[in-house]
Amino acid sequence: MGSDLNTLRFTPIQSFVDSSFFAKLARLKLEKFKLDSSTQYICGFQTRPSKLNKFDDIPTLALDEQSFVEEEIGKDSIANDRLITSGSITNLNTIEEFKAISKQDLLHSWGEDLYQQIMANDTFEYKIFQSFKVLSYSDLKKYKFYYWVSFPTLQSSWTILERNDVINSGIQQDIDSQTKYLNGQFYQLREGRLDTQIEDSSNTELVPTFVFLDSCLSQSKRPSAQLKNYLFYLAKKKGYSEIKVIVYRNNAASFLLKLKLQECPDPWKVVGWERTSQGKLGPKLADLGLLSDPTQLASQAVDLNLKLMKWRVAPELDLDIIKQQKVLLLGAGTLGCYVARALLGWGVCNIKFVDSGRVSYSNPVRQPLFNFEDCFSDNGRGMPKASAAANALKKIFPGVNAQGYEIEVPMIGHPITDEQKQGSQYGVLDDLFNQSDVVFLLMDSREARWLPTVMGVAKGKIVINAALGFDSYLVMRHGNISSLKDKLRLGCYFCNDIVAPEDSLSDRTLDQMCTVTRPGAALMASSLAVELLVSILQHPDKSFANAVENNDDRKKHEEKVEKFSKFGACPHQIRGFLNTFSQNKFHIPNYEHCSACSQKVVDQYIQNGWEFVKDCLNNQGYLEELCGLSKVQEEAELAAQQLLEELSFEEKGEIDSEDLDWIN
């Protein structure tokens, strides 16, 4: 046995894990791996020995976003002058599991795999001898990554019989000329040629010479610990007890070692867990929260909660289609504020508000996007609601594209007073509709919802309507026109009316001017409105999704429903009643004489645009005449007259005095 001073020692390998590695791991964990904690193939990178410089004083394995591969590396290869090292990662689901797993048993299992591969191999295949393992846990809420890298190494002890710091110049030149084209790390030197085929010790009486292309330029003259597995192979499989190893370095600091085997344990022993910077055995922690841009962290956090839905409860959920929606909110009051917050929760990043009002002192307690300062800002007038709501959304989530527009929506029953101004505001509204995919109607009055209803049908937008009573609420979606769906076209907010909307805002008392409603109703209606939108988007027919749910209704509509939303039902109307804490669903077909969505109204709007709108606003009877409601009213009056005549109390005999008393 040699003394400790002559025992061959090594420079340990260190890992360098770039932040992009963890960013990619986080994405894969959320979107691909999910709850799968099985081993996944990865690869690492080392600078080619011929490309080392003075800063490469320790052997380093680098991991980055390119480390994630679909399958195991098939052969020794290089990329951008870097050796590609084969490895794997086991990413556990909980920190408790990460702490509890037996690291020694895990290392032993890796050592067993390495031993079997080495003993079955007849060449120094780099990817086998220099594999690595990563055990990790990803805390995606805090962006902390716990990891421990292992370089499984089979043990054998060697004594240094001779060290020579001067290599024969001819041999040095031979090695220099070949390393530029080699992808491996360990070779047998035969007549100046580097060979991966290794002779057994029984086939030669000479002390063989091997070349180890070192992965560091350590001044301590200690070779990289990557040499260990090659030495174990030579001792265990090839039977060598005495060898020469040229530790090649490209800085003319190569040296030759003559080694004698001290011990090759049987059974084999394995080591390999990386030590911390303090020299202790233990995992490392990468806290990306300290390195990342807070805005980017917020964006990732929003995606986190949503993508977790796909792990177990809703694996088929299409999050991209929700995130891509451009949403227009008409009304930035109580409903508008809550709808906007719910949309943010679903990852919607393009939201526009339209409202002509300003924040008053009664608003902040019921409308969560406003605060006390908004009430007296802008020279005491209060902030415009639309812009204040948009700014508040950006403070909540900087990644949202939120904009506010302070315009009035032209209202049926309210004649034009300033054509230039109102025409300009209509033009802005028209542009906003064209730029949007979804429109929420969240205004205070019925007549304010008429024009957006017409525009939504004419432009084929998804329109969601939410309205409040004192202790009730209504949430509904408007039907769209399609040649394939005409028979089942759903109605709109005005399809139950037999008169066109009128001015309901003039001559009202204070309790009629303010929205008097139980505060919780707005939250319920807003959340239902957003969830209804999500269900529609998850349906293959989108806005044409069928609202029929039971078999009787299906037969009634003569259609067998086979398509469903991934989130279940897509009802037409949801009516809630807080006095009984009940909720009912209804579906109502389009009314052919509807003042907002009938075909005649839609056609006139498409043809004439603003001119049509002006006619409807200035001429109270024009709209009813156009859609046929006037005729319906006339027919109703005629039918009522006929009914009265049929119920006449006049008979052939004289009228009873009791009858006269009742009539009078």
Curated annotation (Swiss-Prot):
Keyword list, A-Z: Autophagy, Cytoplasm, Protein transport, Transport, Ubl conjugation pathway
GO molecular function, one term: Atg12 activating enzyme activity
UniProt motif GXGXXG motif: location: 331-336
InterPro entries xrefs: Atg7 (IPR006285), Atg7_N (IPR032197), Atg7_N_1 (IPR042522), Atg7_N_2 (IPR042523), ThiF/MoeB/HesA (IPR045886), ThiF_NAD_FAD-bd (IPR000594), Ubiquitin-activating_enz (IPR035985)
Subcellular location(s) of the protein: Cytoplasm; Preautophagosomal structure
Listed GO biological process terms: autophagosome assembly; autophagy of mitochondrion; cellular response to nitrogen starvation; cytoplasm to vacuole targeting by the Cvt pathway; piecemeal microautophagy of the nucleus; protein modification by small protein conjugation
Domain of life of the native organism: Eukaryota
GO cellular component, one term: cytosol
Active site: 514
Domain comment (free text): The GxGxxG motif is important for the function, possibly through binding with ATP.
PANTHER family: UBIQUITIN-ACTIVATING ENZYME E1, UBIQUITIN-LIKE MODIFIER-ACTIVATING ENZYME ATG7
NCBIfam families for this protein: E1_like_apg7
Family to which this protein belongs: Belongs to the ATG7 family.
Subunit structure: Homodimer.
Purpose: E1-like activating enzyme involved in the 2 ubiquitin-like systems required for cytoplasm to vacuole transport (Cvt) and autophagy. Activates ATG12 for its conjugation with ATG5 and ATG8 for its conjugation with phosphatidylethanolamine. Both systems are needed for the ATG8 association to Cvt vesicles and autophagosomes membranes. Autophagy is essential for maintenance of amino acid levels and protein synthesis under nitrogen starvation.
Record protein name field: Ubiquitin-like modifier-activating enzyme ATG7
Organism whose genome encodes this protein: Lodderomyces elongisporus (strain ATCC 11503 / CBS 2605 / JCM 1781 / NBRC 1676 / NRRL YB-4239) (Yeast)
Lineage, opening ranks: Eukaryota, Fungi, Dikarya, Ascomycota, Saccharomycotina
